[in-house]
Amino acid sequence: IRLFKKKKVDIFTNNLKKTYPKGQSVEIINSDIILKTLNAVSKNKGYKEHVTSYFYANKRKFKIHNFNLKNNISSINLSIDTLFDFNFVKKVIELSDDKYIGLNMLIKIHNKIKKL
């Protein structure tokens, strides 16, 4: 949030160039921008469920800042859509020594699981 405020942008995201694990997407949108574009967004059925698609489709109209990691770890999947995904995340939790799993620990555990 601090970086979003500091950059003074309309949208602050990690979705344009994906470097974070799947399931770890972040989109912070200035509420004034949402209010200003509500009418345009509501007219298109395609944007009703995924409002942010409107901003990306019209990115020349908005100040969008993408933040990313130096090391791309987007191949790691933390989204739970299947039983396989669930079992992977369950294994990550089981292999963790702590309740909090930071990014560096996540990478270590992921690499450990890949070797199993």
Q: What role is predicted for each listed range?
A:
Residues 1-19:
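Conserved donor-nucleotide/metal-binding helix-loop-beta segment in metal-dependent transferases, i.e.
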Residues 10-13, 35, 44-48, 61-65:
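Short, structured loop/turn "capping" segments at alpha-beta junctions
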Residues 14-26, 71-72:
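A recurrent flexible, glycine/aromatic-enriched loop bordering the glycosyltransferase active site
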Residues 15-16, 41-45, 95-98:
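Short C-terminal domain-edge/linker segments immediately following a structured domain
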Residues 22, 39, 74-77:
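Conserved short-loop catalytic and cofactor-binding motifs
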Residues 24-56:
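Anionic-ligand binding region
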Residues 29, 48-116:
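Conserved alpha/beta core of the MobA/IspD/sugar-nucleotide pyrophosphorylase nucleotidyltransferase superfamily
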